[in-house]
UniProtKB/Swiss-Prot annotation:
Cited function: Flavoenzyme involved in polyamine back-conversion. Catalyzes the oxidation of the secondary amino group of polyamines, such as spermine, spermidine and their acetyl derivatives. Substrate preference is spermidine > spermine > N(1)-acetylspermidine > N(1)-acetylspermine. Plays an important role in the regulation of polyamine intracellular concentration. Involved in the production of hydrogen peroxide during pollen tube growth. Hydrogen peroxide triggers the opening of the hyperpolarization-activated calcium permeable channels in pollen, and thus regulates pollen tube growth.
Induction: By abscisic acid, jasmonate, salicylic acid, wounding and flagellin 22, a pathogen elicitor.
Expression (tissue specificity): Expressed at similar levels in all tissues tested. Highest expression is seen in siliques.
Name the UniProt record assigns to this protein: Polyamine oxidase 3
Amino acid sequence: MESGGKTNRQLRKAICVSTDEKMKKKRSPSVIVIGGGMAGISAARTLQDASFQVVVLESRDRIGGRVHTDYSFGFPVDLGASWLHGVCKENPLAAVIGRLGLPLYRTSGDNSVLYDHDLESYALFDKAGNQVSQELVTKVGENFEHILEEICKVRDEQDEDMSIAQAFSIVFKRNPELRLEGLAHNVLQWYLCRMEGWFAADAETISAKCWDQEELLPGGHGLMVRGYRPVINTLSKGLDIRLSHRITKISRRYSGVKVTTEKGDTFVADAAVIALPLGVLKSGMITFEPKLPQWKQEAINDLGVGIENKIILNFDNVFWPNVEFLGVVAETSYGCSYFLNLHKATSHPVLVYMPAGQLARDIEKKSDEAAANFAFSQLQKILPDASSPINYLVSRWGSDINSLGSYSYDIVNKPHDLYERLRVPLDNLFFAGEATSSSYPGSVHGAYSTGVLAAEDCRMRVLERYGELEHEMEEEAPASVPLLISRM
């Protein structure tokens, strides 16, 4: 996938078109794809399959972006995305996963109050290590769903938006019977903690108007048992990918696009697909020439970027209950904890601590060792005899210069159509990524589908410009292979 020592001159020759060649009607159009995550790889795959000359420029020393499967434990664990949200044939990634025969472990069915988990296999504890009864957890869950229903009524009555936290306060004032005390209050805060984890953001910043605008595919949610790496590797096979190429400038002209890297290398093509994380676009690290129009820049500025991290603890034996997840309830959502039990799905003795929002930001200030110790201290609150982990992994999506956040979400007082505004092409620049998916933001299949869509838009626009619409894309209908789903 790397350049194999090609010189910059050779690279230009590979993707640039001379004046004489432009006169040839049958030449292959050229596209630069900026970003080698799921969106960028799916865009490049689609364009190359349509006989376009494509080069992918990726700032990291690996492909995948926020899809990152690590093998240092001797088996795969995902530091980034790990779920397929919507285990069904309608999911655009289902065909790829099915053809590869990759197993999924279903953690929830449709319409679960916990989004990616059902209340079937869990253990919640208070900070003293006492397990919370299933009856109370179920009762508080029903209360939480009732609160969300009341929030929808509150927001529909008002023109102005508000945060989920503000909406909670209004609901409690109107319906004091929904306000809980003692242990029940702490369990309610744990439900709120899991809602914050879904959006990778704090309730004080999540829009009450837009929190439920994404489309949830049927079939529930499935963990990728072998990780997402096989998917990204398959899609990237045969692509010209240049790693460690950080972009600093994107210049658009009528005749084409010129991209400049921090090392001073330049790449020229007919068009470019920009498949960069929203956090990177927000940072201003990349200069656009000419500047992006106000409507496009506002879309970048006004979408929220959340943070959810993973602290993955690997043990030499299993000492915890045989449930899908463990949790610690507390007086505030910030003080609650959530551990995903990978042993249930993969048979490996691994627990994954997953902080989000401000808690994730605070933990990112710690060293890897301190972060792992913090996660283990949360585990010791509920399992005081827990053995120490033999090794650990820590993600830092918020401070990673290549991501600067985990995924997008709707913030207060900003419209949901910002996703679509970010997606809309700008001359010969096309945009892809989970933050351009109004239906499936924050998901791998959302990123994948926007990459395909950007590639199709790019193909049509470029071929129209060169009068080559007869150069049709060869489509192969993927064989429908059933997904391998388990639930132990």
